[in-house]
Amino acid sequence: MKEYQLYATMGAGFESVVNKELQSMGYKTRVENGRVFFKGGQEDIVRTNLWLRTADRIKILLKEFRATDFDTLFNEIYDFDWAELLPVDAKFPVQGRAVKSKLHSEPDVQSIVKKAIVNKMVDQYHRRGFLPETGNEYPLDIHIYKNVARISLDTTGASLFKRGYRVEHGGAPMKENFAAGLLKLTPYNGTHPLIDPMTGSGTLAIEAALIAKNIAPGTWRKFSFDGFDWFNPCLLYTSPS
């Protein structure tokens, strides 16, 4: 099965927590600011989305390259084999971010990337300049930092803190992955009682219970990869290891 360069994103300061989670699941990791890289196949995409408690998203790094002008950006994106990833009717919204780079206009970066992908797919699928975008969604992300561009596919969709178990929301509730991260920074492992004197909406207590019962935090939700037409729908992991 094909192996991908994957990475988890997380809130500021939680890199070491997510890194420890991934290593406990058996992955070799590399840490950057806001990202932890690891390799895996489709089963690992399912496993990490389902079981990681403290990450935000799991993305596939599709391509990395230097880009200091829009022509280079267009050509590098165009050169990728998009038909292998995107069906002809795919919706593919492009989110962009540019930091400390010559290409600093994020709307322009997004527009160029979108145009390059459309042009390539029109050529690959022998269309006449039109793509319907009526099918499933394949969220793409272009990030340029110090003139190094990375184009990625988001396998998660809504952030992993959206567990799916909360029916109603109180005022300013603590994010679920943040609560799990706080628990991971303590000795708590589910074998002894946890006292939360400021319960609020119960996020800490719920996340503690999930840890104690070894319940996957992604049990109640769907993910972007559920709609990828090349993704094996039979993959399911009931254990983080």
What residues fall within each predicted segment?
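Short loop/turn segments at secondary-structure transitions that flank enzyme active sites
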Residues: 44, 100, 148, 157, ...
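Conserved S-adenosyl-L-methionine
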Residues: 174-239
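Catalytic cores of enzyme domains
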Residues: 131-136, 143-163, 199
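Short capping/connector residues at structural and topological boundaries
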Residues: 65-67, 165, 170, 230-233
